[in-house]
């Protein structure tokens, strides 16, 4: 019998991360420290492939090759409707989709699901996600390696330790944070309040329909292509 999953919202964290005052026709820029390092050389995990030993994803047509965007630097503007932080652009997807379709929609934008390279990036980007909803991020823990790895896996290597982000239950353990053989994918909830600990990350079945956060980063896309 399939388990029934109930979303329970409890008070957790919001960490502010303002937007630099934007001029009339400029891309919003998320505030960040000057010593922020860009993404390093990365390995990209293509979860659209069916070689991961999981039934979590829906069947989708094969991916089509996408051109790799030019590198993003501090002086570049992101596309309209995107935010910029360091060497990345971010798109807050407001359509509710299953994880696989959310990942595909990011790919169609020449992007990946959001992968945090630092806690500063994690806090700044989440602070501008849609409030009071769950958003897919590029973080999963598949059942085929559950006995070997306690931590979930970001969509690229070289990212922050997943145990450091704001899980619902800390210290991080997979099962108490919703993980099961049917709930492999992590989503982030961003509270509309400024109450400490009002936002959190939790595992859900990958077929549930949530919002999502896309990230366009030239280093990640080079690894993907």
Curated annotation (Swiss-Prot):
The keyword Ribosomal protein appears for this protein: no
UniProt keyword Translocase present: no
UniProt KW keywords: Disulfide bond, Glycoprotein, Lectin, Secreted, Signal
Glycosylated residues (UniProt): 217
Any one GO molecular function term: carbohydrate binding
Domain spans labelled C-type lectin: 85-215
GO CC, alphabetical: external side of plasma membrane; extracellular region
Pfam families to which the protein is assigned, alphabetical: Lectin_C
Coiled coil location: none
Biological processes, Gene Ontology terms: immune response
Disulfide bridge positions per record: 106-214, 185-206
Compartments reported by the entry: Secreted
Signal peptide, first to last residue: 1-21
PANTHER family in UniProt: C-TYPE LECTIN DOMAIN-CONTAINING PROTEIN 180, RH26557P
Protein name: C-type lectin domain-containing protein 91
